[in-house]
């Protein structure tokens, strides 16, 4: 019997990527994975439905993949946040889709595909769940030397602009022993860098242990053989404790890199956003981090054009960015998401004002990064090799998240392996990237 060929298109965030990797692990037991949609008997589109742009990208991708039903494709499957949020509506709007699964129903994937192939049945499963997740096996879609490691699912923060709690459910931590087991599995399969993710990593453990236990988890991850770098994302400022900051200073495997989603700094805007912190708390946390760990690279994300954001609020945000000079910064225009409290707030900001404010902040950030990178010339960093483009090796130091932040380009006389770590001396700077050379000097 000819094996079914599956094609998978994964959109959206790193949590979605993990979902795709779990699905691929399941379907490869029954068939073959192909990267060419023209060859696929079954195409799965794992969607993002977080903001308007991501919804549009998801719909466009579904329609693009539906064209292959004129050729070899027999079943088109849509999974992920968009189907969880709009399942029934999408099923009516997109008759080309055979199977629609939400984020809690991936265990029904194989049966739904089988019913579609054998009986022509359409399936819709978009159930809401607060069960604790267990990743099981995964097929990595990243380079083999790094992987994302999810420690919790869902969110209890209920920011007024965000639909994630409605899509992903309440916050559910995984047991420490399950996380450590997965980290060991990843290490045994060649992973050297694990990137810790959740909607909010700093809340980890509160729901199952009665206290926030992220520092304890990081200590245990440090003991996993083969893991050289641990990178931590999505740390909410109000939950960054002295204990966590101390762990950054102590833990030799924990990269001096942290992602802290701040979103804004004006107290009036933060209050309307439903954020738990305020300007005083945020600035104190950032200063405490830099005081205890001076080499810490802090990434953050900001939202401009939130309802009621006045010019003085935006000026306060610009002053904040100028003062703290983040190594990595993402700036997003507020997206009016239906079903969220912010969508019906008064004083919605015009789209052109949002765009102007975003461009202004990004111009500031380009100048800031230019200055930061200039100070790196002649310094030596440990760099992991991510790729080779035929002329240069492409790598990252501890300050760089793969595929998101900048990169370091360098040449080497000998052949290097992907995932190998080398010492690189920085020679030149580009806008966000660096150019260097392999050197014999020590690095860490």
UniProtKB/Swiss-Prot annotation:
The protein's role, per its UniProt record: Catalyzes the methylthiolation of an aspartic acid residue of ribosomal protein uS12.
Cofactor requirements of the protein: [4Fe-4S] cluster
Domain MTTase N-terminal: 4-118
Catalytic reactions on record: L-aspartate(89)-[ribosomal protein uS12]-hydrogen + (sulfur carrier)-SH + AH2 + 2 S-adenosyl-L-methionine = 3-methylsulfanyl-L-aspartate(89)-[ribosomal protein uS12]-hydrogen + (sulfur carrier)-H + 5'-deoxyadenosine + L-methionine + A + S-adenosyl-L-homocysteine + 2 H(+)
List of residues binding [4Fe-4S] cluster 2: 155, 159, 162
PROSITE patterns in UniProt: MTTASE_N, MTTASE_RADICAL, RADICAL_SAM
Main location: cytoplasm
EC number(s) recorded for this UniProt protein: 2.8.4.4
GO molecular function: 4 iron, 4 sulfur cluster binding; aspartic acid methylthiotransferase activity; metal ion binding; protein methylthiotransferase activity
Domain spans labelled TRAM: 374-440
Binding site for [4Fe-4S] cluster 1: 13, 48, 81
Textual note on the cofactor: Binds 2 [4Fe-4S] clusters. One cluster is coordinated with 3 cysteines and an exchangeable S-adenosyl-L-methionine.
Protein name according to UniProt: Ribosomal protein uS12 methylthiotransferase RimO
Enzyme class: transferase
Radical SAM core domain mapped to chain residues: 141-373
The keyword Zinc appears for this protein: no
Keywords, in A-Z order: 4Fe-4S, Cytoplasm, Iron, Iron-sulfur, Metal-binding, S-adenosyl-L-methionine, Transferase
Highest rank taxon of the organism: Bacteria
SMART domains assigned to the protein according to its UniProt record, in alphabetical order: Elp3 (SM00729)
UniProt GO cellular component terms: cytosol
A Pfam family this chain is assigned to: TRAM_2
Family membership noted in the UniProt record: Belongs to the methylthiotransferase family. RimO subfamily.
Localization in the cell: Cytoplasm
